[in-house]
């Protein structure tokens, strides 16, 4: 998993509330366990019409938001069924941070487990970011170490984060990476077990 320390990037405002995981990545794109290539399905029913043509006024189709790495979202983002493909699709598109007033619990956990930073701010702070991102300057900065979001106009907003999750994000540690850190202890245990209980090795 890639470490997350600081992100300076373009922010796209998506003011809709209660965006569920089926809207983030529709079910027809869930037939793979590969993380790459899922960007094409991200917000598919918002981005394309019934004939597969881009819907010009959807935020991610607008030229000024192309290449956005931060999504400013409405309340209760990521609700609905559990699907790890949702953060995968966002990250494959290039979005590394989502800012909202709240996230569905399972989606929130899936984000942290995959290296996508979910940031919870107060409603009035999200409203400021939404407003400013709709202007001429769309650039924001997220500093995980300092736990701050800097708006396009320079306003600073503090966010809370579980210290254990923060540490893992800063170090780029997922479950596998965490386990590999204890590789030496695991090897010692397995060698000792092989001597003490050789019948288990048969």
Swiss-Prot record:
GO terms for molecular function: 3-isopropylmalate dehydratase activity. GO terms for biological process: L-leucine biosynthetic process. CDD domains: IPMI_Swivel. It is an enzyme of class 4 (lyase). Its EC number is 4.2.1.33. GO terms for cellular component: 3-isopropylmalate dehydratase complex. Heterodimer of LeuC and LeuD. This is 3-isopropylmalate dehydratase small subunit. It comes from Caulobacter sp. (strain K31). The gene is leuD.
């Amino acid at each position: 998993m890639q470490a997350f320390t600081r992100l300076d990037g373009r922010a796209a405002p998506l003011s809709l509330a209660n965006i569920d995981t089926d809207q983030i990545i529709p079910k027809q794109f869930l037939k793979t366990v590969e993380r790459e290539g899922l960007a094409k399905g991200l917000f598919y029913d918002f981005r394309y019409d019934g004939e597969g043509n881009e819907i010009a006024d959807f935020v991610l189709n607008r030229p000024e938001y192309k290449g956005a790495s931060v999504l400013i979202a409405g309340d209760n983002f990521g609700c609905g069924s559990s699907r790890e493909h949702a953060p995968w699709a966002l990250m494959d598109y290039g979005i590394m941070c989502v800012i909202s007033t709240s996230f569905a619990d399972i989606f929130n956990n899936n984000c942290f487990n995959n290296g996508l930073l979910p940031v919870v701010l107060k409603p009035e702070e999200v409203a400021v970011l939404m407003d400013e991102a709709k202007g001429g300057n769309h650039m924001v900065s997220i500093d995980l170490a300092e736990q701050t979001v800097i708006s396009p106009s320079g306003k600073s907003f503090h966010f809370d984060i579980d210290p254990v999750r923060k540490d893992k994000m800063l170090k780029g540690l997922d479950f596998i990476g965490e386990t590999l850190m204890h590789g030496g202890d695991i090897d010692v245990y397995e060698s000792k077990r092989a001597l003490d209980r050789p019948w288990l090795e048969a």
